[in-house]
């Protein structure tokens, strides 16, 4: 059984990267002078999460869709990398794969929202872009980000619940063995003493 910190590492990294990427998206809107910088940073973090060789922001969605369909057909297909890949390659518990796949589906929706935000800005609709990015109404970018984080939490919860259960069962098994172990130790000591008694008598 993997230690809890090892098994949860891709999930913890994915969450941290996700929040950083979401912040880059907001900065992209609010700091026109550095939009190119924040766009590059957002793409770099996206690649850390779900890596697609040679992808740009313009091609990322198609690459994600194509590689994900390939994975659904063959779980050994290696067309993408990143934290999602690490988690999907380390499925251990019942229900974990379905939950992990749900995180990719919600992530894909969030990525499509990002492209909509950039398209609105390019069309001169800055107010609409800001509203779509910052609002929490159903169907907006933040709402989809929340759904993505909830899906990620579900995977984490599955891992935590099973690991906690395994640790508890292990401790229970050890506790059950302790009385037997103590009894066997006392018996061994008694037998040893009995075996030495005749030899000690020789020196009297």
Identify the residue ranges that each predicted region occupies.
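Polar/charged, Q/E/K-enriched amphipathic alpha-helical segments with strong coiled-coil propensity
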Residues: 81-149, 167
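Juxtamembrane amphipathic/hinge helix adjacent to a transmembrane helix
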Residues: 146-170
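Juxtamembrane interface at the cytosolic side of transmembrane helices
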Residues: 1, 182-204
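Membrane-proximal N-terminal soluble sensing/regulatory segments of transmembrane proteins
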Residues: 3-102, 128-129, 133
């Amino acid at each position: 059984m993997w230690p809890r910190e090892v098994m949860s590492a891709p999930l913890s990294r994915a969450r941290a990267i996700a929040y950083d990427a979401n912040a880059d998206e907001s900065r992209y809107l609010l700091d026109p002078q550095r939009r190119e910088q924040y766009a590059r940073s957002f793409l770099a973090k996206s690649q850390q999460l779900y890596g697609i060789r040679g992808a740009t922001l313009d091609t990322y969605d198609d690459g994600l869709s194509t590689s994900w369909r390939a994975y659904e057909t063959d779980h050994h297909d290696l067309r993408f990398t990143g934290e999602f890949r690490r988690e999907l390659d380390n499925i251990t518990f019942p229900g974990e794969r379905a939950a992990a796949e749900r995180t990719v589906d919600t992530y894909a929706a969030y990525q499509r929202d990002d492209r909509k935000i950039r398209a609105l800005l390019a069309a001169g609709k800055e107010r609409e872009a800001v509203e779509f990015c910052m609002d929490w109404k159903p169907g907006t970018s933040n709402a989809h980000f929340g759904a993505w984080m909830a899906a990620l939490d579900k995977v984490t919860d599955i891992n935590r619940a099973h690991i906690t259960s395994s640790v508890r069962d292990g401790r229970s098994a050890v506790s059950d063995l302790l009385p037997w172990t103590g009894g066997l130790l006392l018996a061994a000591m008694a037998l040893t003493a009995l075996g030495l008694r005749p030899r000690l008598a020789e020196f009297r």
